[in-house]
Amino acid sequence: MVRYMVTSALPYANGPIHAGHLAGAYLPADIFVRYLRLKGEDVVFICGTDEHGTPISFRALKEGRSPREIVDEFHEHIKITFQRAKISFDFFGRTELPIHYKLSQQFFLKAYENGHLVKKVTKQAYCEHDKMFLPDRFVIGTCPFCGAENQRGDQCEVCGRPLTPEILINPRCALCGRPISFRESAHYYIKMQDFAEKLKRWIENQPWKPNVKNMVLKWIEEGLEERAITRDLNWGIPVPLDEEDMKNKVLYVWFEAPIGYISITMEYFKRLGKPNEWKKYWLNIDSETRVIHFIGKDNIPFHAIFWPAFLMAYGKYKDEEVEAEWNLPYDIPANEYLTLEGKKFSTSRNWAIWVHEFLDVFPADYLRYYLTTIMPETRDSDFSFAEFKTRINEELVNNLGNFVHRAMTFVNRYFDGIVPERGELDELDRQALEEIEKAFEEVGELIMNYRFKDALKRVMELASFGNKYFDHKQPWKTAKEDRARTGTTVNISLQIVKALGILLEPFLPDASEKIWHLLNLDEVKKWKFKELPAGHRVRKAEILFKKVTDEQIIYFILNYMGRNNPEGAKMLLEKYYKREDVIKVAKEKFGEESKIILKRIYKDIKLEEGKEEKEMEYVKFEDFAKLDLRVGKIIEVKDHPNADKLYIVKVDLGKEVRTLVAGLKKYYKPEELLNKYVIIVANLEPKKLRGVESQGMLLAADDGENVALLMPDKEVKLGAKVR
């Protein structure tokens, strides 16, 4: 029996996941795995955070925090985001696991022992201002191949070619922006030319997507060169050699990150109490395992050339139980890029749809559905808010949801919720049953060929057929004159509903579960259709999907994009909506805060366009006296684990320490808040904000663009009352 080891690219633990990530490497893998599970296949689905990338060190330096704090925060954040998006990993690990350190060092040593590494002293990028060697991603400049500016020194985001700081035009430090110099430093390189012919022969025989196969064969034909696999960094996996010039150096993340697929699998089975089970999936013991890596376009060379070369460099794995070669990738179904309203996603400019924010407003199934319909399988595709709304409303609500609701309503209204007997079948009845069988066969074949857009389209065609079948049969008419015929129509309609409940599972797991609940089924879903028996009782009809409204989209743009990227939000709002409609939604959703939000986006807005200022309302002294305002000192600042814009702040009030949640992240760095004297409302009723209880409120001034904390102009006793 074939086994499947399915992986998704390890996301960097230095920031949240956006819709482009989801559409590229995670949603397609999840659809594929859910289908395999329905088929009863032996499949393990693995992922985890890549925690030693230079972006992590970069962010830690900029924020004055330790890399470990960064990766701990984002490992948990990314894990929760995937859970909310219904990505069903068997195990979501991390490369900070001890087992990963051990295995990565083992891979290095085996390549070293087998003669595939060479030490070279080369000139490395160095910043005289920051007094440090610069990893490739800390250097920016112009790509020598395509001329794109502001490209990092490891890979061009425009043409996809690998880069090094040495070949960049006008290289400079990404931290301070100053020109860099180059200093000599010893590093180990993997001799990629050792594997060129073997890789070429192997790749030529792989059934990969043309976009993947053509790219990597072209690279090999152009010649593979030695590539550094160690770095001058203090965060990462130490080089496992006792050599003076290897001290304070780590394994290059592009070398050790893919090893994480194996180490995370090891950790998964270790936690299951089966520490040797991983070998069935990663070692070529019986030629029955298919290792499938789902990745984005930018990861193709690393997974299709370098990663297989690392496995070859290791040679045979050997222990007391087994001696075998590593399984090379069976397939690498890489997707192209997703753009947003015609522009490339940009995390630095906050031109992105962050998944955790989107799921605050819209159900996971809506995001999964739309991303699948536009999945960039063979070419780049675009996320459009207008198309998102149209597809959800016309396809999910009006087609799929409508058919399920019609069938469920009718069986309850005319047959007391009991599946009726089926009478004599006519040609259309038989066609309906054939359509069910054909759908299972065709959808399954499309999924196995990674044609997820077409597979979902085929599922929706069955829902469309169900509506046409229902309309043609007109059971609302036959119910009055031919109950048996009506029973047949309802029976077959419910068979289609059940089929949809299974067929939707890989794509829309929540909708699939709702249909299963409506049909009152407790059987395990399988990719083999078994009819609902006559006499089975179903539940009352419920609405499966609700329409997406303009108000929801405006709210999302205002509340999330508007706070992070006001110019981008303005462009979107002006593209789709009248300003008065935006103002109306802002007033309804945000109240008084709407003025601040609108002013941030529309610089030219007049107050009367938003809301007239009320005359000042006086507060009675006895009401003001109820506030207990105290002086405190901030002694600790941490990122909120469940919110990007919030800090968790500890404030010393002299006799006690309070925990507060404060929305200051956009305006203050942690080090700017530490040891500051502040004013807090001490008798405010505690309230949980994103899962953390806030025991008071910091006082601050807000003019719509800037926020400034209120602070005493000289030190006073902690806990002193403000009068």
UniProtKB/Swiss-Prot annotation:
Q: Where in the cell is it found?
A: Cytoplasm
What residue ranges are annotated as transmembrane?
Answer: none
Q: What is its main location?
A: cytoplasm
Could you tell me what reaction this enzyme catalyses?
Answer: tRNA(Met) + L-methionine + ATP = L-methionyl-tRNA(Met) + AMP + diphosphate
**The UniProt record lists the keyword Transferase:** no
Please name the GO terms of the biological process aspect recorded for this protein, alphabetically.
methionyl-tRNA aminoacylation
Q: Name the domain of life.
A: Archaea
Motif 'KMSKS' region: where in chain: 344-348
Binding positions (ATP): 347
Cofactor(s) listed in the protein's UniProt record: Zn(2+)
At which positions is Zn(2+) bound? 143, 146, 156, 159
Q: What is its EC number?
A: 6.1.1.10
Q: Which InterPro entries match?
A: aa-tRNA-synth_I_CS, Anticodon_Met, Met-tRNA-synth_bsu_C, Met-tRNA_ligase_1, Met-tRNA_synth, Methionyl/Leucyl_tRNA_Synth, MetRS_core, MetRS_Zn
Gene Ontology cellular-component annotations = cytosol
Locus of motif 'HIGH' region = 11-21
Tell me which PANTHER family the record gives.
METHIONINE--TRNA LIGASE, METHIONINE--TRNA LIGASE, CYTOPLASMIC
Subunit arrangement? Answer: Homodimer.
What protein family is recorded?
Belongs to the class-I aminoacyl-tRNA synthetase family. MetG type 1 subfamily.
Stated name of the protein: Methionine--tRNA ligase
